[in-house]
Amino acid sequence: ILIGLVGSEMCIRDRTRVVMEHTGRYYEAVAKALHEAGFFVCAVNPLLIKEYGANSLRRVKTDKADAVKIARYALDNWADLRDFTPMDAIRYDLKTLNRQFQLASKQRTASANNLIALLEQSFPGIRKCFDSPVRSDGTQKWVDFAHSFWHVDCVRKQPFPAFCERYRKWCKRHAYLFKLSNAEEVYALAKRAVVLTPKSKVVKVLVQEAANQLISISRSVEVYRAEMDRLAAMLPEYPVVMAMYGVGKSYGPQLMAEIGDVRRFERKQALVAFAGIDPMPNQSGDKNVRSNKSSKRGSPYLRKTLFNVIRTYLQCAPQDEPVFQFLNRKRAEGKPFYVYMLAAANKFLRRYYAKLRDYFASLDTLQSVDPIPTTLKASL
């Protein structure tokens, strides 16, 4: 059908516009092919199509009904349709990596909870004895320890000097720091532990396979994180984003992946609406709610990253940072936790937009690389 449409003499490209919903990823190949063939292509937010022209009591959901609805939307908004332009390769790869990173992070959390639950049956409380962070290869001390010492009997069935020497060799073999106090803490925990399951081959398989699964997923997470930072460093706004407080080599590439090129947003309110942290006005007659909920109709991945950035402000409390000053003022006013956190995220996003717009304005030769994929006019 596409080949026939491109080669059709009846199709006047200057007067033909292709409008589609940008659902998932399967629309991108079609939109790119038609765009390269010279057609005007517009990818519309599915929510705008869903809420458009809902003037019937019947709920019909067929391909034909959806096509008619999209066509009516296109005719009514003909002058406001935005031409689709494919995203450049770096930003596209960065966004894809970020989505895989977020998925792997969820899987790592689930795998860690699963391993902790299994250890509560064979070695309860061992997780709290270690606080080492995840290394660049995805390994973590408590996970490797659980793989080798998967039951309390692996520790308490031998004298403390023998366990201490074995633990010292284990730390050297896995390149971990040996602490005598840590060995004493683990041995004391094993001595007083009350376990549900006895030492058996089944318990060994369960714990070790859960540990292997967690290590594998953690390694994937760290690979994604390093690759995202490498790709983000190729973008022109990388030094400006990384110079902002609360943004490091993990959160910076995530922000750049989800926001894209800020020049595609006409003003800062559009970026706030894109993130879904804009307040929804609630007024009817004499009712006028002053504390409104956020719309949450934007990218959930972007909102999660913003929340983590603001949590960094909350933990470090930089007194000279405008975002923290704004957050602290809202907290002093007695606002609830999520209210002042979202307000601070809104403030951070506006500063992000202003800094990058000023930076891009200083680069006269730099061209925009990716336009906004949705019609934001209705979201503002």
Predicted regions mapped to residue ranges:
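Single conserved hydrophobic/aromatic residue that forms the stacking wall/gate
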Residues: 1-12
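A short, charged helix-loop
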Residues: 71-96, 189-194
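Short alpha-helix plus adjacent loop in nuclease-associated cores
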Residues: 35, 42-83, 151, 287-297
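Glycine-rich, often acidic, oxyanion-interacting loops/wings at catalytic, nucleic-acid
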Residues: 101-238
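Short glycine-rich phosphate-binding loop at a beta-alpha junction
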Residues: 15-26
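Phosphate-backbone recognition surface of nucleic-acid-processing proteins
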Residues: 163, 170, 239-243, 249-333, ...
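Basic, amphipathic alpha-helical segments enriched in Lys/Arg and hydrophobic/aromatic residues
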Residues: 331-380
